[in-house]
Each structure stands twice: as structure tokens, then as C-alpha cells.
Amino acid sequence: MSSSKALIKTLIKNPTRIKSKSQAKQLHAQFIRTQSLSHTSASIVISIYTNLKLLHEALLLFKTLKSPPVLAWKSVIRCFTDQSLFSKALASFVEMRASGRCPDHNVFPSVLKSCTMMMDLRFGESVHGFIVRLGMDCDLYTGNALMNMYAKLLGMGSKISVGNVFDEMPQRTSNSGDEDVKAETCIMPFGIDSVRRVFEVMPRKDVVSYNTIIAGYAQSGMYEDALRMVREMGTTDLKPDSFTLSSVLPIFSEYVDVIKGKEIHGYVIRKGIDSDVYIGSSLVDMYAKSARIEDSERVFSRLYCRDGISWNSLVAGYVQNGRYNEALRLFRQMVTAKVKPGAVAFSSVIPACAHLATLHLGKQLHGYVLRGGFGSNIFIASALVDMYSKCGNIKAARKIFDRMNVLDEVSWTAIIMGHALHGHGHEAVSLFEEMKRQGVKPNQVAFVAVLTACSHVGLVDEAWGYFNSMTKVYGLNQELEHYAAVADLLGRAGKLEEAYNFISKMCVEPTGSVWSTLLSSCSVHKNLELAEKVAEKIFTVDSENMGAYVLMCNMYASNGRWKEMAKLRLRMRKKGLRKKPACSWIEMKNKTHGFVSGDRSHPSMDKINEFLKAVMEQMEKEGYVADTSGVLHDVDEEHKRELLFGHSERLAVAFGIINTEPGTTIRVTKNIRICTDCHVAIKFISKITEREIIVRDNSRFHHFNRGNCSCGDYW
């Protein structure tokens, strides 16, 4: 018996000496054999079972106790919580209270965590009140659990201030509770003030303490405060670790301060921690956001161990820097390397398909998303809506949108902009109004979308209403994109002088891109006099605006003013400017075929020319007359018609038709504005071939069908 008592005393001091299920069962059996299984010893065995996550064995023994001690209750409640059985943990707490047992400070952290995970703020507040009545609100771990609960559930009706919880916690040390609790608290922007207050009164601080406050400041956008804490840390004997540096590096990418970032990179190399995956991912992200993608690639290539975060960082970096093909290539390598793509990876790579207008790759990614179980992720679903819209399949985009269970301003904006770019202006406006009725507050991007929609269908009065409501109703500042959309609207409506005055009186300095919207309208309405004034405005603020030079050359050519055009082209040559080659591409059998205006190198060029000659005869019979006014060469009319014949969009459309079954929709993408003559020609081709032809240029989608275009001949 004395040996059993000695064993009990030893286990009371250190029950974690039992490391396996067999050892725990042997101890349990020994207590039974020696008839020493009292409530105290049973509670110890229950504690050991729960430490080993043997919930079934713990509950069997627990149920044999007529009046379980607090230690037994604590062990069972904690085990329920650790195994995510939160409702059972709370039910056990209620049962414990009903039994007359008074919980000690070891019980409350598990109970409060269960309240947090169940999102049961009301129950949590009642527990908080009970804690205060017992005088246990000063316990360090209980206070941390309270902070975590309020940080996560604040804003759901709580009348208790998070700061007050800390006011009642006089005990503070560098080991101030569970690290998960600290991490969860510090990332909440509204919790950073409370974190700071705790940090300031801590008598001793360690690296974890500094990491918590630095990460909190950084993730709350309080970069100067984060850097101040790094400098303060440098005055102590503490040294930054990988978590410190991975928190600080993103700050420099936000500041675009790559010099300081490289200094930290040097420190990392000297300390021999450059292979750390967290630091590596942060370095990749920092260099990418600083437009130094080659440095990102070098850091990535030197990582011995690459996790999903490091892969995602470089994929996102490629997309941020407009290197969409590289992003898709790296994503394929990621999948080949057996790294399972997560939500972040899909959210990064899907926009690459949108920018490249590669529908077949977008569909493949959509399949990956569904197989990976991410179909309900709001960020991925919104990216898919945007991708299908920009790849010319607005029906698929709308189908995904209509199936989304949760909609935010991003998903609403994606579908509104999609309909706007496809010429469905009235539908886009209707969706914008529905978004407001659903209680979703439009942001600045949403207003760009609805103003674009109004512009494409000529809703002048509605556009003015939306533009003015930004500041008066929603407190949003109008930015350059909003002014450009209104200027474009006025120009499309033929109100060129009003558009000129509107831009001249902008609250912010108009850029070349804003003036360029009006220049395009001058070209459409053939107002050369105003176009010259607008062009000079553009060249003043953006002397290398290639689009403005090309538009003015087109206008001079169409008016037969070859001398002025020659002067402008000489001006371009002196500046070293060259017209961007007109390129169009089309996907065919999972392969992208590209065409450049005037290029005859494509293997199918003979068949393309044969088709175009045949269809041209039918077009001319139905009234087609080539519009050669935009040809920038002083040559005879026959030569001009030959030049138009080789435009890239026409070649791509012809290639699509001769390589698909009758009735198949043709989708073509062009890098610049579709030319006037090709626009007319493709309308005829759509009628003759009975095809729907969708052309995406650099401003919108043109849906050609039965001889008409969705843009109403205004783009």
C-alpha cells in the first residue's frame, strides 16, 4: 500500500511520465488490484488518458465516479475541446456546475475556447461573468482565453470591452499563454491595441513576445510601429528569428523599399537561415511586389524545402508582374511536384488565364477547383466569374455567380464588369441595383464597373447619378478610372466639348489615359480639330503615349493630311517610339494560334486566303465596301484593300471558321482596338457563315451575330 501511495504522489507531481496507452492501462489496472482507485487516483488516470487523447477510456472511468473531482471534470472538458467536440465540452461544464462542483482556473481556458469555436458569444459572456464572481479573472491563461474569444467574436453583440479583460489581468510574463491564442489575437486589427497594452506592461519579454507585437502591427498595416519594435528588439539581447523576419519583409514590399529588404536578406544569409521556408516565401513575395521578379526566382530556386506558401508566392509574383505564361508554367510544375494547390494558389493563377484569354486552361483550372473541393470558396468563385467573363463566356460566368451561396462586393463587381464589357449595360446596371438592395456596399471598383456599363449603352443621366453618389452617399473619392469612364460616356454620346470641359476641371490632374478616352471619341466622331487639342494635352503629360500617336496618324490619314501624318511619325521616330504590332490569337484544340497583321507565315495561310477571297465575294454582293481611311500608307486604293485583307483579327476569324464545325462559336482576342473595316467585315462574315463570333479587343467584347455587333457600332 505504501508503494501505491508513493506512486500516486509521484504521478500527482508529474503525470506526463506515462507516455503510452499500454502504460496508462497498466497503471489503471495496478490501482484496481491494490484497491486504491479512489476519486483522486481515478482523476489522475483520467488526466493521463486525456493527455494521450484516449477519450473513450477516460469517459468509461469518469462515469464510474459518483462525484467527480474538479481535476476529472477539467480533464474531460479539455479533451472534448482538444478533439473539437465543443458542444460536449460546454455541456460538461454545465453539468459540472449543476453537480455543485466549483471550477478552478484550469477549467476556463478550454470552456472559453469552445465558446469561441461554437461562436457562442452569449454563453461566453455568462462564463466571463462567472469568472469575475469567482475572482479568477486575474488568471493569466483565463485572461488570454477571454481575449481570444472577444477578438474573434467582437461585433456580434458584445457589450463587454476587450480592453477591460486586460485591465483585470495583473499577471504578465513573456510566456503569457498559448501561442495560438496570441497569434489569433494579434492578427485581428481591432485587437492590436489590447496586444500593445499587454506588451508594454510585461516585465520580461522574449522573442515570442516581440514576434507577436511585430506581426500584429504589420498585419494591421501599422508599419512604422512594427519597424519601431524591430529597432527596440535590436537594443536587447534578443535576436530576430524566422518569424520576426517573415513579418517584417512584407512591410518593405508595401513601401517598395527593396534596399532595406536586401539588407535583411543579407542578414538572413549571414545567419544561415536563408533556406527557411517562411523567410524564403517572404523574400519571394517582397521581391515580386518590388518588381524584381528575377530576384524572386533566385530565392525560390535556392529553397531546399518548398511548401505551398513558397510556390504560391512566386505564382502570385508572376501574375502581379504581368508574366502570366510563367505563372501557368509554374503552377503546372507545382502540381507535378505533388504539392496540392490551395485556395491561394487558385486565386492567383486563375486571373492569369483571364489576362491571357485562354479559355481551355481556365476550364482545366475550374476542374482542379471542383476536384479539390474549393468550388464554394468565395474568392475562387469570384476569380472564376472574372475569368470566364474575360475569356468571352459570359454565360458560364453568370452560371457560377448564380450558384454562389455567399456574395461579397468582389463577386458582385466581377459579374457587373463582365456584363459591362460584353455590352450588356442594362443587365449590369440592374445587377448593381440588386447588389445595393442585398445590403452590399459598392466599393470604388464596383463604381468603375457600373460607369463602364452606362458608357457602353449610353445611360448618361444614370451615370451622372452614380458618379455623384460616390461622395454624397458612400463617402468614396472619385479616382482617375471614374473620371475616365464618365469622359468616355460623354464622348460616346457625342458630347465632345462637354467631355473636354469635364476633364479640364477634374479635381485631380488628368493623365494621358483619361485624355485618350476623349481622343478615341474624337476619332469616332471625326472631330479632327478637337482631337489635335486633346493630343497636345496627352503629349504634355505623357510624351510617349503610343496609342495617341497612332490615333492621330489614323485621323490624319483618313483626312488625306499626309504631311501632318509624316511630321507626327518623324516625331515618333525621334523619340524611338514604334507602333505596337497588331496581334490576334485564337484557341484551337487546346493550342493557341497567333496572327500578326501582314504576316503570311502561318502554315494554314493558303487555306485562310482561299476562305477570305470566297467570303469577300459574297460580302461585296451584299453591299460591303472596304473602309481604307485608316490605312497609314499613301498608296493606291487597291493596295490599301490588300493591307486590310491581312489584318490579324480577320486572319484569326478565318482560321477559326475553317477549322471548326458549322455553328461553332469563334472566340478571338486582339491586343489593340479592332479596326473599323474589320469590324464591318466580321459583321458580314457572321451573317454569311451563320456563326457567332466574339472578338475581345483592348477595351471590350464584340459579339457578332447575324450581321450585327453587341457594341452597336460604337467602341
Swiss-Prot record:
Gene Ontology MF, one: zinc ion binding
Renumbered ranges of PPR repeats: 38-68, 69-103, 104-138, 139-172, 206-240, 241-275, 276-306, 307-341, 342-376, 377-407, 408-442, 443-473, 479-509
Keyword Kinase: no
Region (Type E motif): 514-589
UniProt KW Protein transport keyword: no
GO BP terms, alphabetized: RNA modification
Protein name in the entry: Putative pentatricopeptide repeat-containing protein At3g23330
